Amino acid sequence: MQFESLAVDLRHWLRENIERGFGREALVQSLRAAGHPPKFARQAVDLALARAGRRLA
C-alpha cells in the first residue's frame, strides 16, 4: 500500500492529527474505532508517519 492510495479525506485526517501531535497508537486506535481493520489501520498510520518524517515507534 502507498500513502497516495489512501482516500483523500483519510490522508488529510492523518496529516492533520500527526501535526497536532497524536502518536501512532492513538491514531491506530482512532482508525480501528472508525471501523477500519487492524492491519489497514497500522499500515495507514505507518505510511503517514513515514511521510511526515516521524518515528514509527
Enumerate the predicted regions with their spans:
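Eukaryotic low-complexity, mixed-charge intrinsically disordered interaction/regulatory segments enriched
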Residues: 1-57
